[in-house]
Amino acid sequence: MKKIAALTMVRNDGFFLGKWTAYYGALLGKENLYIFFDGEDQTVPECTRGCFTKLLPRVEGNVQASDKKRIDIMSEFASGLLERYDMIIGTDIDEFVIVDPALGKSLPEFLSGVDMDGFNSVSALGVDVIQNIRKEIGLDTDKPLLSQRRFARLSTRYTKSSVLCKPVQWGSGFHRTRKGNYHIIPGLYLFHFGCADMSFLGLKMDDKDLSERGWNHHLFKRRRMMKQLPCLPVRKWDTWTKRAVWLQARIRHFYAWNKPAMLGLRIVVEIPDRFSSLV
């Protein structure tokens, strides 16, 4: 079995930090989780006991500049970890790399079986979980998230180079590596929960600090997608996840050869019940 670690950086998000440490800790062991806090004003919560934690000086700048500074910190740290680990999973705090339960393998078992010859990273198909505001109420924070959310968009934005096996530089937000193509693996998904609850999104939109750093445009796009989702047709998961992997493995933007594309398709799928207890 390959030795695998996970790392992230967080600021003012205790809810998803708790979910992140519980999910990856159960799979990898909390001693293999590395958590950076963006700002020395942050409090390290009890849920991170047993993990490596570090308070960093606040990363300054607008959203683009600060994202680049943060990913540079984590890329350098991941390169050092690869002297002791075979793979490093890097995600935002609201992202979870999940193996299809139908395969009957844990995340470490699945990744240990991936042929990495010629690649520096592994990518999971991006699954942007979105609240259907006509059918789904606000999240109960004490229950599994996927037991309360059934719809998602298959998104190239969240098909990220999330798993490193060589010491290379991540692009901002883990979206790519700066040297190398995508290696998208069927049966592996990155679930993103930034659009999973309208009230959570509203809190971010009201956050003065995020607004001053230029997050408004991105957050308004999320809200627009949440309003559009109930009007889009819902496709079958097993059919369209396979098609999405095929498309994203082959199609690239002409201006960014190492970013996957999907011909502008907006594919909404229903998440199968087999995922409901995982996060």
For each of these PLM feature ranges, what is it?
Residues 20-23, 73-77, 109-110:
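Short, hydrophobic/aromatic alpha-helical segments in well-folded domains
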Residues 34-37:
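Short internal beta-strands
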Residues 3-5:
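Cell-envelope/extracellular polymer assembly enzymes that use nucleotide-activated donors
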Residues 8-19, 39:
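Active-site beta-to-alpha loop of glycosyltransferases that engages the nucleotide-sugar donor
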Residues 30, 85, 116-119:
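Short, high-confidence coil segments that cap the C-terminus of an alpha-helix
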Residues 67-72, 101-279:
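Catalytic-site signature of metal-activated, phosphate-bearing donor transferases
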Residues 41-91, 98-102:
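Active-site-proximal specificity loops/subdomain of glycosyltransferases
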Residues 22-31:
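Short, acidic, metal-binding catalytic loop of nucleotide-sugar glycosyltransferases
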